[in-house]
Amino acid sequence: MATTVGASSQFTSGVLEAAEQELRRTVSGEVRFDKFSRVLYSTDAGNYQMEPVGVVIPRGPEDVLATVEVARKHKIPVLPRCGATSLSGQCVNHAIVLDFTKHMDRVLEVNTEERWVR
């Protein structure tokens, strides 16, 4: 029987270890699966607390794509996080948290006609 990790029993330690190893190989930004980082990212400005399975701090769009691909392969949800100012728990979940605040913190382009932002 597989062991489980963290607050969520839906992911086995083997799945999380494989995902972490793949992320470390493919992401140029920071990959944090340690207990301290997971606890640090388990809350936002609200009262909710849910420990993520890991945290990725992407340096650019390639890191975001790599994270989503690894998460999809291992069936792990992805949760984008920016300001963590939600009072209703939108920034916390049993997922891989993508923290955009360190390197990807600017709007590069706004297209009002097509209604998208990059």
Predicted region positions:
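Noncatalytic alpha-helical scaffold of FAD-dependent oxidoreductases
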Residues: 1-118
